[in-house]
Every structure is written in C-alpha cells, then in structure tokens.
C-alpha cells in the first residue's frame, strides 16, 4: 500500500526547521556607503610577506611536448601578495577576480603567462610583491617497449612565480613522478630474483633567470626522474613487455641513494636550473616502512 504524507509547503517546512525571515537592518547595502575595514589606514606593527588564498581549484589549459599536446586539466592555485604595515588587509576578492579574467581570455598556463599574472596581481592589489603557485596532473602517452601499445601516464607538476617590483621575478618548477626500483643488495645476495618496488621521485628546480627555458620543462624533469631508476612504469604491458621491463629493472638495480644522486647529476647538467631539491621514496615491498633520501644543491 502506498504511504501518503501530508507535507506543508516548502517555506513552512523551512520555518519548522528553524528558518526565520530576513531582518530589515539599518546598515547600508550600497558598496560605496559600506565601511571598508581592510583599507583602514593605521600602524599595524608589521609588514606581511604573503597573504592571500590557497586551494583554489580551477580548470586550466596546458601545452605538452608529449601526446596529448594540448590538455585541459585541473589546477590547484595559491595567490598571495605582500601587505604593508599601514594596511589592515588585502582585497581578497580581487585575487579570484583576476583568475576569472585570465580564464575568460583562454590563457594557457606556462611560465610566461604566470609571470604576467604575478606582475598584474601586484599592481591590482597595490602591493610591491605577489606570488602565484599552481599544481596539476600532467598526462602523457607511454608506449610499451615490445608490443608498442600506448596508454596514458601522469605526473604531478608544480609551478611557482614570485614578483617583486624592485627585485624582479623568481621561478620554481617541480614534478612528482613514479618509477620502479630494484634493490642491488637483494640482487647480490639472492640465488635468484630480487625485491623491487615503486619509487616516488619529487624534484623542485629553481630556475636560472638568465638562461633560456626548455620548450617543455615537464618532459625534462620527467626524464631526469624516470631514466635514473631501475625501470619506467607503464599503463599497458603485455607478456613480452612485462618480460622486458622486469629484465630491465634487474639490469639496473638502484638503491634510493642511487636514484637521488643520478637524478641530481642530470639536473646539474641542465643550464636552466640554478638550484634543486630532490626526494626519493621507495615503498619497500619487503618492509612495512618506506626508504627515503633527500638532497639539495645550489650551483652558485
């Protein structure tokens, strides 16, 4: 038998659960008549280096030297500016307003456009400096070694641009990529086989402002991370491919320290990088813990 309920109208339901009528207030509703608290001048004791918003999710367009060459992905943004000691606060709504303007102009996110964005942000916010950071998944085609079947892999990319009206720009590029590592000790002491696992390589590269950037920094950082591990990861592997990848890992055993140092050597040879930090983490297959190594280096 159908159960019938006798429900009151929706406004009455809302009132029953606590909703009340709007209060007719006395404060102004016109923007020009409202008190502007954050722009109230006074001595607020300290300058602030960075203030703004973070974790702003927004669709972005990126270019890639690996297929797919043009991609729409999701960027997680952070926008900050400096704040002088005589200003109480910033106009935070202007931060996401500017993002929307760039989006409506169909911008492609790269270091050129991020530099424009950071400089515009400082001007719009009437501050001497501004920073913009964005992280996003970057997809690229990976072809299996023997059967030549293709699939999409991804790595996480991070880009930061900071602008100061007197000091100019500073930029960092980063990647988090995955690869296979096979333990040299396990290979050496075992009659057969060796334990292997997935390794996570995180790179942060500080960009040399005097050098020419590569066409696609993402691909260069990916190569530095992947080619110094035991073997690459693949989305599609048939048996001939799996045989080749397994043997390749056995032919190139790597401790976490080895991956770290070999990756550092590649980054050292890249003229567009002035300094870097690397972290390598192995999700150990025969332990419950991870193996980790970190390194930082400045060419200056």
From Swiss-Prot:
One of its GO terms (molecular function) is GTP cyclohydrolase I activity. The keyword Membrane does not apply. GO terms for biological process: tetrahydrofolate biosynthetic process. It is an enzyme of class 3 (hydrolase). Keywords: Hydrolase. It comes from the Bacteria. InterPro entries: GTP_cyclohydrolase_FolE2, GTP_cyclohydrolase_FolE2/MptA. Pathway: Cofactor biosynthesis; 7,8-dihydroneopterin triphosphate biosynthesis; 7,8-dihydroneopterin triphosphate from GTP: step 1/1. It catalyses: GTP + H2O = 7,8-dihydroneopterin 3'-triphosphate + formate + H(+). Its EC number is 3.5.4.16. The record marks 183 as: May be catalytically important. Converts GTP to 7,8-dihydroneopterin triphosphate. Belongs to the GTP cyclohydrolase IV family. This is GTP cyclohydrolase FolE2. It comes from Bacillus licheniformis (strain ATCC 14580 / DSM 13 / JCM 2505 / CCUG 7422 / NBRC 12200 / NCIMB 9375 / NCTC 10341 / NRRL NRS-1264 / Gibson 46).
């Amino acid at each position: 038998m159908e159960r019938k309920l006798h429900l009151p109208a929706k406004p009455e339901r809302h009132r029953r659960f606590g909703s009340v009528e709007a209060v007719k207030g006395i404060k102004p509703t016109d923007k020009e008549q409202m008190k502007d608290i954050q722009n109230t001048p006074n001595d607020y004791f300290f300058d602030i280096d960075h203030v703004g918003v973070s974790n702003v999710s927004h669709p972005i367009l990126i270019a890639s030297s690996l297929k797919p060459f043009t991609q729409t992905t999701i960027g997680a943004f952070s926008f900050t500016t400096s704040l002088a000691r005589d200003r109480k606060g910033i106009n935070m709504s202007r931060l996401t307003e500017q993002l929307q303007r760039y989006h409506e102009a169909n911008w492609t996110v790269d270091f050129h456009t991020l530099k424009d964005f950071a400089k515009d942000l400082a001007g719009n916010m009437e501050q001497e400096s501004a920073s913009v950071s964005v992280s996003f998944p970057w997809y690229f085609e990976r072809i299996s070694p023997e059967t030549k079947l293709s699939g999409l892999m991804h790595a996480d990319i991070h880009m930061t641009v900071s602008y100061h009206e007197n000091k100019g720009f500073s930029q960092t590029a980063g990647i988090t990529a995955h690869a296979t590592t096979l333990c040299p000790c396990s290979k050496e002491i075992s009659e057969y086989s060796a334990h292997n696992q997935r390794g996570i390589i995180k790179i942060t590269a500080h960009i040399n402002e005097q050098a020419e950037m590569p066409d696609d920094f993402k691909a260069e950082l990916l190569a530095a991370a992947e080619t110094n591990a035991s073997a690459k990861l693949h989305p599609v592997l048939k048996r001939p491919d799996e045989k080749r990848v397994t043997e390749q890992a056995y032919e190139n055993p790597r401790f976490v320290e080895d991956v770290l140092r070999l990756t550092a050597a590649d980054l050292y040879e890249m003229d567009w990088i002035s300094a870097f930090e690397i972290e390598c983490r192995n999700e150990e297959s025969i332990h419950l813990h991870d193996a980790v190594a970190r390194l930082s280096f400045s060419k200056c």
